[in-house]
């Protein structure tokens, strides 16, 4: 999931 990587940065 694309957003999963986004949250990983957070």
UniProtKB/Swiss-Prot annotation:
The entry's keywords: Amidation, Neuropeptide, Secreted
Modified residues (Methionine amide): 10
InterPro entries named in the record: Tachy_Neuro_lke_CS
Entry's Gene Ontology BP terms: neuropeptide signaling pathway
GO cellular component term of the entry, any: extracellular region
Location of this chain's protein in the cell: Secreted
UniProt similarity note: Belongs to the tachykinin family.
Role description: Tachykinins are active peptides which excite neurons, evoke behavioral responses, are potent vasodilators and secretagogues, and contract (directly or indirectly) many smooth muscles.
Protein name (Swiss-Prot/TrEMBL): Ranatachykinin-B
């Amino acid at each position: 999931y694309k957003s999963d990587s986004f949250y990983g940065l957070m």
